[in-house]
């Protein structure tokens, strides 16, 4: 095959999907004569077509002009001369400013990048593609084999797609479906841009073969359309090799019938799910649905659902680009290894945002027998309440019951909020989950759940472009209850603009703040607990979330710098604000962890470069020192819990979090931790005038118990909240008797002496 033609076919096949190309400086396709790129006069597309309409794609035989008219370039008025330069000196034989013949792939990519620079047009993806697995397959010899070449070579992929050699293992293993290649597969090459893109950049069409059951000689070639939307789209193209389901909707897997648990009760409720065999159906990491499908009805034997995989938005224009650009390199077949360089995908799959899904998959594979059984077991493994309750515990896409939660417990809600915080409907009414099985605009619920996917935070995963909500102004809704006669005003907090970290702030600010308690009017101080919610680190960082006692100062000391990380005020710590500056400046950025820990929870290394930049010399951090501070932080919260228990207020880590100590033993007994026994009489501790301060102490405990990094985010704010809460709840007076209050808990056997010692070491002998 002509190498010139291969390059000619590939010229415009680099990342042409995302934005209008008006402004590239090219002549339009209608033939307006002027000066084109390269400074040579243009002649218009009509003149080009006169000669080049006879030039065909060397593999499909289709006219390159026909292909070009299907391209994004054509639809946006970017003519032939927009890429090749003016043709006035060409006339079929003369020079072109930007010819393709004889040009290297690097030269062609550079020409594309003259527009695809990320400003005029989407950034060229050529560098990512060149370094990815498609251009550098694990086994180059696979491209030379007749069957394997279908998905492991440039020519085989195009020939196979045209011949309808596409589908599950039943098709690919059937000799009757295999095409007769017009050339020896030994001559085939690895994939290029033109493998997936026609001349001009349009996506290639893929075909498959179907037949009518029981009807002889009914086999026919039809468009491959597994998402059944009658559109030649990205899902069709990518799944022609990375197959997810058949044309009839059958899930790809081992070919076995899977038994899926559908009940939270042990040993009851299963559903049979038929799978069609993938060609590579004996290794889980070669079968895409093992990580890219969530069984709708699956449950665990405790509570909540199981999320077995990512849910692809099949009917969007670029569902694969929701997470993948042109890098095509995930390295997720196992968690680590010298031959598996780290990737964002490897990080995310082990992160809390990803529900630690990959860890569940790898663990299941390690326990499974080999072959098809491995595929089956890994397909059924997933995130559960044990590892990812924030994603699995409720049916978050059920708008009627969980609409208010969708902003932070679904990617759909998160992306919609970050796109337009001011216009976001906090009831969830504006969120559409039609990509989830069974969810419609009328029933508004599905049994599938989302994790925090790439597109929740990013607009373009391939370039890493983040959504841009701007500085967050959070309106914490007032507490109102007709049943208790409670009324409350909204509390508005304006947070600073911290660039990329604004994205993190969207979900790490809490649902209520301490000032919500102060804004309540209640006649008797008997009402439900005001819940801060979980992981409110952003609010702690800026000192806004806690219940602050009157007469006490909570201002940061002058030397406090954590809220300035990732800004110009803290050179060398990045430019994307404190959240990204601390949690994403590590070799494993999308684990979102600034440290590593061993199996006991002890910190083994501080990996965030921001920590090292600031904490040097006398103030250098060590893993041992940071572990000790974390343990003392936890101990101080145990002391606060004990002090609350001394007043009959028991903490238990389940909503509504505080319960009555009916037997006065200071322990949250099973019969006490039920919703009907929730603690509500806040005025009963120190009288109606002080009910808010009593609830405030409980609020601060709940707030910081659910911020496990509170000792690092803003240790001054955290220490002051804990100190003041213990100080007040002990005797109803702010008199700095915290040491005595902690010792009293030991005397009452609500706290052991070792924990008390650690708590006092953390808080000190005077108010922090």
Swiss-Prot record:
Residues binding heme c 1, per UniProt: 48, 51-52
Binding sites annotated in the UniProt record for heme c 4: 148, 151-152
CC per GO annotation: cell outer membrane
Residues bound to heme c 3: 112, 115-116
Binding-site residues, heme c 12: 611, 614-615
Membrane topology, record value: Lipid-anchor
Lipid positions (N-palmitoyl cysteine): 24
Signal peptide region: 1-23
Record's keyword annotation contains Lipoprotein: yes
Lipid attachment site numbers (S-diacylglycerol cysteine): 24
Binding of heme c 11, residues: 579, 582-583
Residues given in the record as heme c 9 binding sites: 454, 457-458
Free-text description of this protein's post-translational modifications in UniProt: Binds 12 heme c groups per subunit.
Gene3D superfamilies: Flavocytochrome C3, Chain A
Superkingdom to which the source organism belongs: Bacteria
Deleted gene: phenotype: No impact on growth with fumarate, or on the ability to reduce Fe(3+).
Pfam families: Cytochrome_C554 (PF13435)
Positions of heme c 6 binding: 238, 241-242
Subcellular location(s) of the protein: Cell outer membrane
Residues annotated to bind heme c 2: 80, 83-84
Binding-site positions, heme c 10: 504, 507-508
Binding site for heme c 5: 193, 196-197
Function in brief: Not involved in Fe(3+) reduction.
Annotated protein name in UniProt: C-type polyheme cytochrome OmcC
Gene name, Swiss-Prot/TrEMBL: omcC
């Amino acid at each position: 095959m002509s190498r010139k033609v291969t390059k000619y076919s590939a010229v415009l096949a680099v990342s042409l999907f995302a934005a209008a190309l008006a402004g590239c400086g090219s002549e339009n396709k209608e033939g307006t004569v002027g000066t084109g790129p390269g400074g040579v006069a243009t002649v218009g597309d009509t003149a080009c077509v006169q000669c080049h309409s006879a030039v065909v794609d060397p593999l499909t035989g289709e006219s390159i002009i026909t292909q070009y008219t299907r391209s994004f370039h054509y639809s946006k008025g970017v003519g032939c001369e927009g890429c090749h330069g003016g043709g006035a000196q060409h006339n079929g034989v003369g020079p072109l400013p930007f010819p393709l013949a004889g040009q290297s792939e690097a030269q062609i990519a550079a020409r594309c990048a003259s527009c695809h620079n990320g400003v005029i047009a989407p950034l060229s993806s050529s560098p990512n593609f060149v370094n990815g697995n498609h251009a550098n397959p694990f086994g180059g010899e696979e491209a030379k084999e007749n069957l394997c070449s279908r998905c492991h070579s440039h020519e085989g992929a195009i020939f196979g797609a045209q011949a309808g050699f596409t589908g599950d293992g039943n098709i690919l293993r059937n000799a009757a479906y295999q095409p007769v290649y017009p050339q020896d597969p030994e001559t085939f090459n690895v994939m290029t841009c033109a493998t997936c893109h026609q001349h001009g950049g349009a996506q290639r069409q893929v075909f498959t073969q179907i037949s009518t059951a029981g009807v002889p000689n009914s086999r026919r070639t039809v468009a491959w359309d597994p998402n059944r939307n009658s559109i030649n789209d990205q899902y069709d193209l990518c799944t022609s090799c990375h197959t997810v389901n058949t044309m009839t909707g059958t899930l790809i897997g081992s070919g076995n019938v899977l038994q899926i648990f559908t009940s939270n009760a042990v040993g009851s409720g299963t559903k049979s799910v038929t799978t069609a065999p993938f060609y590579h159906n004996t290794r889980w990491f070669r079968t895409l649905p093992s990580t890219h499908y969530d069984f709708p009805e699956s449950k665990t034997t405790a509570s909540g659902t199981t999320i077995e995989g990512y849910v692809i938005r099949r009917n969007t224009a670029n569902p694969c680009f929701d997470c993948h650009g042109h890098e095509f390199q995930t390295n997720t077949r196992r968690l680590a290894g010298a031959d598996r360089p780290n990737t964002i995908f490897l990080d995310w799959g082990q992160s809390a945002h990803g529900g630690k899904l990959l860890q569940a998959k790898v663990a299941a594979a390690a326990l499974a027998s080999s072959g098809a059984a491995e595929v089956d077991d890994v397909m059924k493994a997933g995130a559960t309440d044990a590892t990812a309750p924030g994603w699995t515990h409720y049916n978050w896409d059920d708008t009627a019951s969980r609409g208010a939660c969708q902003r932070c417990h679904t990617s759909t809600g998160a992306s919609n909020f970050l796109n337009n915080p001011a216009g976001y409907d906090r009831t969830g009414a504006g969120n559409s989950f039609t990509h989830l099985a069974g969810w419609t605009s009328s029933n508004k619920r599905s049994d599938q759940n989302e994790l925090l996917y790439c597109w929740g935070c990013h607009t373009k995963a391939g370039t890493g472009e983040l959504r841009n909500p701007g500085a967050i102004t959070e309106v914490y809704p007032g507490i109102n209850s007709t049943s208790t006669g409670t009324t409350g005003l909204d509390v508005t907090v304006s947070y600073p603009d911290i660039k990329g970290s604004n994205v993190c702030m969207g979900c790490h600010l809490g649902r209520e703040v301490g000032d919500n308690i102060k804004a309540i009017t209640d006649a008797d101080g008997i009402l439900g607990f005001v819940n801060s919610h979980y992981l409110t680190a952003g609010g702690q960082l800026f000192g806004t979330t806690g219940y602050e006692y009157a007469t006490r100062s909570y201002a940061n000391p002058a030397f406090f710098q954590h809220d300035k990380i990732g800004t110009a005020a803290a050179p060398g710590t990045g430019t994307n604000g404190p959240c990204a500056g601390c949690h994403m400046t590590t070799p494993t950025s999308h684990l979102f962890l600034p440290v590593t820990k061993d199996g006991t929870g002890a910190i083994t290394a501080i990996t965030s470069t921001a920590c090292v930049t600031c904490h040097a010399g006398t103030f250098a951090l060590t893993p041992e020192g940071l572990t000790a501070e974390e343990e003392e932080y936890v101990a101080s919260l145990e002391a606060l819990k004990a002090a609350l228990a001394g007043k009959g207020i028991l903490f238990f880590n389940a909503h509504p979090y505080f319960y009555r100590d009916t037997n006065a033993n200071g322990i949250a007994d099973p019969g006490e931790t039920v919703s009907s026994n929730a603690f509500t009489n806040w005025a009963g501790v120190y009288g109606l005038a002080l009910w808010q301060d009593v609830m405030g102490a409980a609020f601060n405990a709940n707030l910081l118990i659910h911020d496990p990094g509170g000792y690092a985010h803003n240790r001054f704010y955290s220490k002051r909240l804990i100190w003041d809460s213990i100080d007040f709840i002990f005797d109803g007076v702010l008199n700095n008797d915290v040491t005595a209050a902690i010792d009293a808990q030991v005397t009452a056997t609500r706290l052991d002496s070792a924990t008390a010692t650690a708590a006092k070491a953390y808080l000190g002998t005077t108010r922090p």
